[in-house]
């Protein structure tokens, strides 16, 4: 048996790491097992390899995109076949995969589970095995690029937790979301490029590159807006632009600072006070030569129990069969249904609300980023 994650990675073909984990799990537990990953929509677990007697797919609402919050692990049992045991492979507060046993393990698999979580995350840099299993239908080139640029869906900044995801339209690819921990806090953002398909995806990728380069180079939010503006202009394509909310978080003071660039405003939710927009920091979309990017950021203290919610227009404009948009009323209903408000619960509620508003395919990517002080 492998004694550490790196030993698992010594497999000559890293596509076999998943099968090796299942083989060792079955040998240790004395029960048939299979490895599952979450799909990109966050609505089911899909079998990668293992016992054919277990289902190919298990419906579940416990995911944020393809990631499973550690806090939701116990509820995964509700999606399992009768008598089955589920063990999430958890790393840094979230699981990217789970082991499912057809019966109770008779041996101790705890050490294997801990090693396997790290090994699989490292192996993903070298094999598409897990990435392929997460897709329930083919992605366009634009949507594939979008997924490759995604940050972790669940993370911690100093003084806050972050949960985020994009419910993909699979052939659009113009949205991006991002976050990064920094000393004392971090950055987060959501953006949407005009149009659909490869052009929107290319604009989005260039803009995200400019955003990250500015952040990593020590710039501030105004610098980031200017960098995105210049990068989109440099493409020299007619009538292209990008909307965005760019924000930073200071943990010690519990302060959010933001710029709103022609995008839906950042919002704050509180169970007793409802949903409100944050005012200020406004400016035009980025990438149009006749318009200057905003330079005056706004700030607000985020109180305990409040949640910062950033969304793209794909959330607000998702329509029911009768033509009614999801809108802010849909956001309010989704957030009001949380049992215990948190970044993870809020992101999950919004994504589930958008997905269940109408059973038809998404016409636009639906993106959400939620920050909660802790």
Task: Describe the predicted segments one by one.
Residues 72-91:
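A short, aliphatic-rich beta-strand micro-motif
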Residues 103-121, 206-209:
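Amphipathic alpha-helical "output/dimerization" segments
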Residues 29-31, 139-151, 158, 200-284, ...:
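Catalytic core of PPM/PP2C metal-dependent serine/threonine phosphatase domains
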Residues 197-217, 282, 306-361:
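Active-site-proximal, acidic helix/loop segment immediately C-terminal to a metal-coordinating Asp/Glu
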Residues 1-54, 238:
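Helix-loop-beta substructure at the N-terminus of cytosolic sensory domains
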Residues 1-24, 128, 148-150, 211-215, ...:
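Short regulatory/linker helices and ligand/cofactor-binding micro-motifs at input modules
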Residues 83, 242, 280-322, 360-363:
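Acidic loop->beta-strand submotif enriched in PP2C/PPM serine/threonine phosphatases
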Residues 115-173:
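Regulatory cytosolic signal-relay segments
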């Amino acid at each position: 048996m492998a004694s550490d994650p790196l030993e698992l990675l010594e497999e000559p073909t890293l596509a076999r790491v998943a099968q090796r984990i299942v083989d060792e799990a079955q040998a240790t537990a004395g029960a048939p097992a299979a490895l599952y990953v979450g799909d990109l929509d966050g609505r089911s677990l899909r079998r990668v390899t293992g016992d054919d007697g277990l289902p190919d797919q298990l419906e579940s609402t416990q995911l944020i995109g393809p990631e499973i919050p550690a806090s939701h692990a116990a509820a995964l049992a509700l999606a399992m076949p009768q008598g089955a045991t589920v063990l999430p492979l958890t790393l840094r507060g979230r699981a990217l995969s789970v082991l499912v046993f057809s019966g109770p393990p008779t041996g101790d698999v705890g050490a294997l589970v801990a090693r396997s979580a790290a090994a699989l995350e490292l192996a993903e840099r070298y094999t598409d095995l897990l990435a392929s299993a997460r897709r329930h239908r083919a992605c366009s080139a634009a949507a594939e690029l979008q997924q490759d640029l995604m940050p972790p869906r669940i993370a911690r900044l100093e003084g806050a937790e972050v949960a985020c995801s994009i419910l993909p339209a699979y052939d659009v690819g113009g949205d991006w979301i991002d976050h990064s921990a920094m000393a004392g806090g971090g950055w987060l953002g959501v953006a949407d490029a005009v149009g659909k398909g490869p052009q929107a995806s290319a604009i989005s990728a260039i803009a995200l590159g400019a955003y990250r380069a500015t952040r990593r180079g020590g710039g501030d939010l105004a610098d980031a807006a200017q960098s995105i503006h210049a990068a989109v202009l440099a493409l020299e394509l007619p009538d292209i632009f990008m909307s965005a909310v760019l924000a930073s978080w200071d943990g010690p003071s519990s302060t959010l600072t933001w710029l709103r660039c022609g995008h839906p405003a950042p919002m704050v939710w509180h169970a007793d006070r409802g949903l409100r927009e944050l005012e200020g920091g406004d400016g035009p979309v980025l990438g149009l030569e006749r318009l200057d990017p905003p330079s005056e950021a706004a700030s607000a203290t985020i109180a305990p129990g409040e949640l910062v919610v950033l969304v793209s227009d794909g959330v607000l404009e998702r329509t029911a069969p009768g033509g009614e948009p999801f809108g802010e009323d849909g956001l309010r209903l989704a957030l009001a249904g949380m049992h215990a408000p948190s970044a993870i619960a809020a992101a999950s509620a919004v994504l589930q609300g958008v997905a269940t508003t109408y059973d038809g395919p998404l016409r636009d990517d639906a993106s959400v980023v939620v920050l909660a002080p802790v």
